[in-house]
Amino acid sequence: MDTLSKAYKLLSLIAISGECSKDVYPFLYLTDSYNEKLMTRLKSDGLIKIHYKDKLRGIRLTRRGKDLLLSLSPERFSNNLTDNSETNRPRSDLPRRLRLQQASIAYAMLQCAGIPVYPEDKPALFSGNPQDSAKFALPLFYTAREWKELGAETIKINNSRSLGILLCEDALYVLYFTGDHPIKWEYRTELRLKAFLNYHLKQDIFAGLCQKNTDYPIKAIFLGSPMDSARILMESNGGFQKSYFYLDGSFDFMHFLPVSMEGITLLKLLCSPALQSTLNTLLLSDLEPVNPDLGLIHDTIKGTTPVLLSYNFDMLRLSRFKTALSFHEITGHLICFDFQKDTLQSYFGDLATIETIDLAKFERRFFH
């Protein structure tokens, strides 16, 4: 099998996920007609099977499919397709299957954004050897399974809802998948995860990739669909006993990305501090400096109106801006991408006016 083919890419994604969702197809650039032919061929070759239970349909590898991948690239698949790993022997209960499928979507989005997810494309997480990292460039993604290789040290964070961590030049992002509703959330567990990552960053967990003892902010990214799920998250109160997500401040930054090609563009932007700086400079060029006397968070002033750059969709920052506007009984102004406008308008109502960045024009200028 050609390791550059779309068939191999799909099989690889199933292998590292355990069970794949059909929602990954757009990120693999599979059209409906091509996808139907591809699935038929892979099933007839005995490489995949469809697992259907509890009204959830997923794609799994057959024994033959696993053997093929192990023969083609043992260094890529041995950890996922051997022993009793969850990806090699996925369970049938609905919550676990949903988590595997959510992981498959997240991995597909990361790959679509050009971010490595396979072990041979990145240094070992706890190697401690800068030479191992010399040939790799950021950003890099590590799954939750990879950090759990520390064993007993990670017992207290085993219940974290995180799918993994994304290391960029200026920050470390903890990745979550929320879907169309608030995910289950245990504040103390996620705080322990943040403390765990902060400790190991300072101990040079990523030898050669980032400078030891540098203060890298640890932020969160939430993947959800549709875009309006962000409003649901920002308005969530955590439910009974605070067992579901709400803006609890466990992270200082909580970004929302839609599960879509628009989300891919936003992911690339978050991973590029240079591009964010360029965009900020363009957006702020005709506006006035921050006014500290206003007593609320803002990035610039338009006339007498506080303006917030909202394109990175930091839910915590947006929530604080809304609260401050309401408290001071003033109107604010938001600058966001066009695909984010409806959600922000619904969330802010009359408290803010909105100016949009044309996503298509942005992509043509910076990504083509």
Task: Show where each model-derived region lies.
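Short secondary-structure junctions
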Residues: 46-50, 116-120, 278-287
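General detector of folded, globular domains
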Residues: 63-76, 80-83, 91-112, 117-120, ...
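Long, compositionally biased intrinsically disordered regions
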Residues: 175-183, 213, 217-368
